[in-house]
């Protein structure tokens, strides 16, 4: 049998095999057998050396025509098989449109994010800029720049997660302030910033403590900034978050990076200052710490403390949310319980 007869026979047999294939697996096997790299057409091409030179052109042309025909028929057969499979599925699989629909569930903002977004908008409206810093910080920026050298006893006030001797999970967002302070160009105006973010401390988790919580620290540096400016700012923050009817007071305190240092209390939400178990019968609840920036902090950042001064404050966003919404357990913030979270949808703005 010469090659022309073999091509004619392959033509007839190939079309017959393609027409018999009823699934994609069988069709792929036919494709490999006919036009694959080791298929029948390839074998014929490899035997071209036995064809007389004057017939090689015609044989090659016949092989190419047959390959094109097989590929076209194979593609058409595959399309028909896919359509048949889909038609069968549509016939067998039905949707019962009489079943009741399932209502889509909309998420809601986390209560801490509600407080965070509200405070960020509030401070931006007062001309502050919002700064985000790294959560893995250096000892230099978290402590040394903040007037806490390595031998300072106040370091024991913060149980810090150290990664190595120089790097740590930040225990406060003060590092953001230090980074901005040392780069700020005061010839272009005062520095007003807030730095929100996660902080970490080696606390045992319970109803009032967490190894991770959200903090926002603020910093204002300019000429002629006074304690009165700080007091007015803190009062505005407290009344904005907790309501205009809240009374406030400042108490002396101690923080290494401010001097003088104060803590702010607001009148108890439960008893309006009359005294109850929530406020430990004092009528007041502590909400934040603040103070006038220590001259050493300014000098560490290359700022002349004889010319510039300012104030700083730190807000625990978890604590603000606990107080504002009457939450009993700080761990509720981190359990991802939808039943707990969805009750704050009405607080979104």
UniProtKB/Swiss-Prot annotation:
Keywords: Aminoacyl-tRNA synthetase, ATP-binding, Cytoplasm, Ligase, Magnesium, Metal-binding, Nucleotide-binding, Protein biosynthesis. Its EC number is 6.1.1.20. It catalyses: tRNA(Phe) + L-phenylalanine + ATP = L-phenylalanyl-tRNA(Phe) + AMP + diphosphate + H(+). Mg(2+) binds at residue 259. The keyword Magnesium applies. It is found in: Cytoplasm. GO terms for biological process: phenylalanyl-tRNA aminoacylation. It comes from the Bacteria. GO terms for cellular component: cytoplasm. Its main location: cytoplasm. Its cofactor is Mg(2+). Binds 2 magnesium ions per tetramer. Disulfide bonds: none annotated. GO terms for molecular function: ATP binding; catalytic activity, acting on a protein; magnesium ion binding; phenylalanine-tRNA ligase activity; transferase activity; tRNA binding. PANTHER family: PHENYLALANINE--TRNA LIGASE, MITOCHONDRIAL, PHENYLALANYL-TRNA SYNTHETASE. Tetramer of two alpha and two beta subunits. Belongs to the class-II aminoacyl-tRNA synthetase family. Phe-tRNA synthetase alpha subunit type 1 subfamily. This is Phenylalanine--tRNA ligase alpha subunit. It comes from Lactobacillus acidophilus (strain ATCC 700396 / NCK56 / N2 / NCFM). The gene is pheS.
